[in-house]
């Protein structure tokens, strides 16, 4: 075993699933520092995987409870973009299969952009159905952001390719006959809502990046329409766009000056 290089040991550890593996027992006895570091790394990785598995199982409790009642089509719903000064509010409704599993799934705001993009692609492949609802700044100004968010959520449900039997919604109640459960901080407590938050976030971010290309002086691709110092300074210099929400302060005050 001493003849195995560090690189070979690293590759072998990638194949090993549990401590009972004979190869693992041999590597445990290898006293080279490089090998022992790899063994420690393996333990940490397995610990992380176990925590992610437990977290995922905990986040599946709402879905599992409904499935035990014979409910199959469960739509998780979430929104992104209630707070920004520019751009639409975007919602997603996602129906997942019973065998859906993506370790590390969480509230989209807690994930790196790279992870969100990867999870977005995986959810697209695994989901039974995905619906997206987008409400423009003009409609937000007309009916207010709360009503616009509800409208976007209803649109997302309507855009599903199947009719959901139950809705799991992040902190909202919708005017629909479909049975629903409102969950505070649902994007961190339900896999379906978490998946919806990722679809909504990536969809909106891509739209704001396109807006950034159209209006490079505003830096939309950096702040996604939120009221950062950079964004407010750009509005002061270059003015208010159609994409801005005129009913939101401080834009409302700028227009009234």
Swiss-Prot record:
Its EC number is 3.1.26.4. Keywords: Cytoplasm, Endonuclease, Hydrolase, Manganese, Metal-binding, Nuclease. It is found in: Cytoplasm. One of its GO terms (molecular function) is manganese ion binding. Its cofactor is Mn(2+); Mg(2+). It catalyses: Endonucleolytic cleavage to 5'-phosphomonoester. One of its GO terms (cellular component) is ribonuclease H2 complex. A divalent metal cation binds at residues 78-79, 170. GO terms for biological process: DNA replication, removal of RNA primer; mismatch repair. Belongs to the RNase HII family. Endonuclease that specifically degrades the RNA of RNA-DNA hybrids. This is Ribonuclease HII. The gene is rnhB.
